[in-house]
Structure formats: C-alpha cells, structure tokens
Amino acid sequence: MSYYLNSENHLDSGPIYVRENGQLHMVNLALDDVRSSLQKPRPFRLFPKGFSVELCMNREDDTAQKEKTDHFIFTYTREGNLRYSAKSLFSLVLGFISDNVDHIDSLIGFPEQIAEKLFSAAEARQKFTEPGAGLRALQKFTEAYGSLVLCSLCLRNRYLVISEKLEEIKSFRELTCLDLSCCKLGDEHELLEHLTNEALSSVTQLRLKDNCLSDAGVRKMTAPVRVMKRGLENLSLLDLSCNPEITDAGIGYLFSFRKLNCLDISGTGLKDIKAVKHKLQTHIGLVHSKVPLKEFDHSNCKTEGWADQIVLQWERVTLEAMKPQETLESRTAAQHFYGKRARTEAPGKYPLTEAHMNSSEKLQFYKEKAADCHGPLLKHEALSSQESKKSKKRAFEEPEKEQGSSSQTSKQKYVCLAVEDWDLLNSY
C-alpha cells in the first residue's frame, strides 16, 4: 500500500486548486479514503535557480567593441573623476584608413606630412607585417615617396629577414646605403640581381662582406654598368671583403665604377696583390691605405627612414616563428633517457667568418683629392718640367715677360687636366 501511494505521489502532476465562494482552495486526492496530511505547496520557478537576465543590444566581437570605445579619449580630472572627450575627425579618419591601408589605390601627389602620420598609424597596427596585405601597403608608400620611406637599409647578419621578406625588401626605392654583410647570398641570389635594377641606381654605399661571392657574381653585378652605363653607376663605396672566391680577374670588373672612392677587398683570393694595387691606381685612381679606413667600421651604417621600425618588426616576427616548439627541459630529459650527448644551442646570429687580420693585411683603397689624383705620376712630371724650365732659364736667359707669362699659363693648363685625360694618356 505504501509502495502504491509512493508511486502515485511520484506520478502525481501536482496539487489541484478549486475556487469556492470566491476563495481558492487546494484539494489533495485521496485513494481508498487515505488522506494525506496537507503539505505546503512547492513554488514553481519559471527559470532555473541561478538564471540571470543580461541585456544584449548587439553581440559583437572584441574588435568591434574596441572600435566603439576608440572614438573617445578618457582622462581624469583633478578631483579624480573620469572624463571623456571625442576624438577629432582627422584622428578617426586616419585610423580607419590605416586599418584598410592595403586597399588604397595610390598615394602619388598626397602631402608628405599626412602620409608620414598615416604610415606611423599603420605601423602601430602592424599592418606591414601581415602577409600579402603588408606588401601591397608598403608598395603604395615606396612608389610615392621613395627615399622618405627608407634611405638607408642595414641588413647585416639578418639572412632570415631576407629570406622571409625578400619581396618587401625589393620594394624599397631610392636607397643610398645598403648593407648586406654576412648574409651568405651567393652569386645566384635574387637580391644580388635586383641590385642592378634601375630602382637602386641611387645606391652610393654597398657592403657585400662575407656573402660567398665569386668572380661570376662580380661580373653579373657590374654588367649593366659596363655594357649599358646603368645600374650601380653612382657607387662611391664598395665592401667586398671576406669573399675568398674573388680573384684578380674579378677585380678587373670593378674598373667600370668610375665614381668609386673607397674599396675594401681584404680577405679575397688575390694572387698578385702588387699588380692589383697598380691597376686600381692606374684605372680608377684608388690608392692603398696603410691604416684601416673609418668608412668600413660599420659605425655609420644604420636603417633610416619611416620604415626603420618595420625592419625590427620583421626581425622579431621571423625569430618568433623560428623558435622550436619543444622546451629545453623536455629535450634534455629525452637526451638523458636515450643516452645522447647534449646538443650545443646555436646562437641566433652567427659570428663573422672574417679572420682577424692585421692592419697590414687589410686591402682597403681610397681615392685621393682632386689635386692629388694620380699623385706619383703627376708629381714626377711636374718636377721634371720645373727642372727643365730652370735649366733653360740658366742656359738661355730670356727676361721677356711675355714668354714668362705664356710658360705659366701652359703650366696651369697642364696641371688642370681631368682624370679622364690622364687615363687616356696612360693608356698609350
């Protein structure tokens, strides 16, 4: 009986309410005249316990919420109260364009002051590190502003950045200084071929130290200058040190750089150094320096321009992508388990392969001033002419002023010959 009552109570749908004489009463069902004691009814809940109501006007992601609050500037008053003010229309428009900078058609003719602010805003949002979109955005700036975006680029020992951001690096125009030292490019690298393009004809300082170059690479680099008088025709400083595959034949290709003032060929595979010194002095007027030149100490080369911080962002992103996924502790534990020797961790930047050369072993050349150009030859001929004139004056005393003035003018004409004239005379 008790089991039956329990089962009925279990299947009971709840209390029954009856209105009688305007009052509401609860009637419990009784089975076989068994009346259960009246129990207090349990209140029904429309929602489960712990339910809370949240008013959601518009469900958006965090970026959309950030955009809504980004329109205001929050400050605190002296009393400590929070005060907000709306940003200027220029700031709002600048932020919107920088978020969509890769969709700009062209920036040619746009004011430089506004373009610099737009570039800084896009850089702060790291738009130039995005694959695809960053390259398109960077090309819009470089084709419109050239050297303002970047006039000097130092990629010394940053071979990972070159391999990952090659197209972005090739988009820079009107560079004047380019440092690619210790990047192991080789003769067939795409960037070495890009150096001969007209977009980099403005380069005046080029450093290719320790890049596994040979005579073939030097020939390829100088071909546009030798054949079509284009390419690196404005080059004034060249560093080819620590490239042992460059021989005497490769140095001969450098004679086409008529504006070259400083040259470093230390650590190359030269056979007849004395003959190379003579050829450099004869053809392009470069004299061997007995002391190291300050132009090759790498103190003046650095990245300059609007995009100087972008290169650092590229390097940081590249290094983070190259980090190993496994931790050092798990690796050492596995090595101890399998009985292997610990592997020495390679540093992020390899040391220079340059041998520690003394100052006497350095082959650095410089061009003397215009008055001292082709110094030994010019001084010798000037001294011989003066001695011959003195002997003539002693033997034939001619006190006429006209002949004296004519000899002085002829001497001035002789000294003021151009460098090309001396090269032509020395070729006979």
UniProtKB/Swiss-Prot annotation:
Source superkingdom: Eukaryota
Pfam families the record matches: LRR_6
Keywords, alphabetical: Leucine-rich repeat, Phosphoprotein, Repeat
Disordered: region residues: 379-412
LRR repeats: from-to residues: 149-170, 174-195, 202-222, 234-255, 259-280
Biased composition regions of type Basic and acidic residues, renumbered to the chain: 394-403
Entry-linked InterPro entries: Leu-rich_rpt, LRR_dom_sf, LRRC42
Residue numbers bearing the Phosphoserine modification: S406, S407
UniProt similarity note: Belongs to the LRRC42 family.
Record protein name field: Leucine-rich repeat-containing protein 42
Lineage: Eukaryota, Metazoa, Chordata, Craniata, Vertebrata
